[in-house]
Amino acid sequence: MDNRTAIIKQPDNISFFNDVYKLQKEYQDALILDNSNPDFIWIGEHQLCYTLGRGSNYDNLLFSLNDAKYDVFKIDRGGEVTCHMPGQLVTYLVLDLKNFNKDLNWYLRKIEEIIIKILGAFNINCHSREGFTGVWIGNKKIASIGIGCKRWITINGFSINIDCELENFNKIVPCGIENCLMANMIDYNKNLNIQEVKRIVKKIIQEEFNFDFISQ
């Protein structure tokens, strides 16, 4: 496969979800108009917020929207409700799957493989789970995946819990899975930090998709 150009953004500050979601949509629209435009990768952290997929069940929110003290967004992705917050590393991929494989199941499995390699770089053993999307350590979920796709151009991506307040997941039924336990990477490797994880995420995505990155 020939190398493909991708713009990559890796902000050090905590980013507002809605700003980054709008940015993804702009890059998706640009690729739909002209597939010679670059793909786009964003790696960073969000303020505390909750997002729901297209067909999400609001019963999986364990708080009243009218009294919510945090932002809640319904967005163009599959899957149920999840939580974003500082200490969790989020990666968004706006890719033209026509350059890779026009198969969403292949793409989901590819993302799971990428996450497993990322955690493996820190000597953390993890696995996918039949019948579910995401990555697990034993019976605890450490990474969530949610993607949207329009004309084979993807948006959204995956989140990995590094060192975040897992109590925030208690306000929802994570990914619609009853009694779902969550985990942080720091619980399995005390020596890592989010900047080092970010570096490994960039490296593995570059290798897996044969990207030439342009930093912004």
UniProtKB/Swiss-Prot annotation:
Keywords: Acyltransferase, Cytoplasm, Transferase. The keyword Methyltransferase does not apply. Residues 35-213 form the BPL/LPL catalytic domain. Catalyzes the transfer of endogenously produced octanoic acid from octanoyl-acyl-carrier-protein onto the lipoyl domains of lipoate-dependent enzymes. Lipoyl-ACP can also act as a substrate although octanoyl-ACP is likely to be the physiological substrate. In the reaction, the free carboxyl group of octanoic acid is attached via an amide linkage to the epsilon-amino group of a specific lysine residue of lipoyl domains of lipoate-dependent enzymes. It catalyses: octanoyl-[ACP] + L-lysyl-[protein] = N(6)-octanoyl-L-lysyl-[protein] + holo-[ACP] + H(+). The active site is at residue 175. CDD domains: LipB. The gene is lipB. This is Octanoyltransferase. Pathway: Protein modification; protein lipoylation via endogenous pathway; protein N(6)-(lipoyl)lysine from octanoyl-[acyl-carrier-protein]: step 1/2. It comes from Prochlorococcus marinus (strain AS9601). Belongs to the LipB family. GO terms for molecular function: lipoyl(octanoyl) transferase activity. The record marks 141 as: Lowers pKa of active site Cys. GO terms for cellular component: cytoplasm. Gene3D superfamilies: Bira Bifunctional Protein, Domain 2. Its main location: cytoplasm. Substrate binds at residues 77-84, 144-146, 157-159. HAMAP family: LipB. Its EC number is 2.3.1.181. It is found in: Cytoplasm. GO terms for biological process: protein modification process. It comes from the Bacteria.
